[in-house]
């Protein structure tokens, strides 16, 4: 019993630490206080790292997560801050977990085509109603969110994407579930 309680306290402490870090980061991004360390980054590698980290952190058995490359062998590079881009993907994956306590299948797909890199995170969870999806697709709505059901994590995602010159689209997947597609300008390595 003591071990179970200690584990619960540890997990809650990690969650609180993560929330404080997200709050600090979103404030820094909002007021342009967060330096963006721009370098050529491989979004395929960042996607693999984000999925591996979630799997290695003890993903509960009611969740499945998979990673795939849209076009294997084709570079998916952009100019950006690797740590922030990884944080963005981590937030999207964890958003699927938090909002689907019954479990779900999560798919992370990365690729490049037509001068753009794309990161897509989908789940077959409970999804969202059409009005909320439409509101999330309005940057002002997400940027003005002050916490709430889909608040700080998605606000942080929007801010990271905006800082990298990207776009975000939220959509319904299948009969239920959520899909988020993020695109960035591709970095030409020629």
How should each PLM-predicted stretch be described?
Residues 11-16:
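Short alpha-helical segment of the dimerization/phosphotransfer core of two-component systems
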Residues 31-36, 75-80:
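Conserved micro-motifs of the catalytic ATP-binding
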Residues 37-52:
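A conserved beta-strand-to-alpha-helix junction within the catalytic ATP-binding
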Residues 57-68:
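Short conserved segments within the C-terminal catalytic ATPase subdomain
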Residues 96-97:
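Short helix-loop "hinge" at the ATP-lid/N-box region of the Bergerat-fold HATPase_c
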Residues 128-141:
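Short conserved segment of the HATPase_c
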């Amino acid at each position: 019993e003591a071990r179970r309680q200690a584990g619960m306290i540890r997990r809650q402490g990690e969650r609180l630490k993560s929330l404080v870090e997200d709050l600090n980061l979103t404030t820094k991004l909002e007021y342009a206080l967060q330096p963006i360390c721009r370098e050529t980054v491989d979004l395929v590698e960042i996607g693999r790292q984000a999925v591996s980290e979630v799997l290695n952190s003890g993903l509960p058995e009611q969740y499945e997560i998979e990673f795939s490359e849209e076009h294997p062998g084709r570079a998916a590079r952009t100019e950006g801050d690797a740590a922030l881009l990884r944080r963005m993907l981590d937030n999207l994956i964890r958003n699927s977990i938090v909002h689907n306590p019954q479990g779900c299948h999560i798919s992370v797909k990365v690729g490049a085509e037509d001068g753009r890199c794309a990161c897509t995170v989908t789940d077959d969870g409970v999804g969202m109603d059409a009005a909320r999806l439409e509101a999330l697709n309005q940057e002002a709505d997400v940027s003005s969110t002050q916490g709430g059901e889909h608040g700080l994590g998605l606000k942080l995602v929007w801010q990271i994407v905006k800082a990298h010159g990207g776009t975000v689209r939220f959509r319904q997947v299948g009969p239920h579930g959520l899909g988020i597609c993020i695109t960035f300008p591709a970095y030409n390595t020629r």
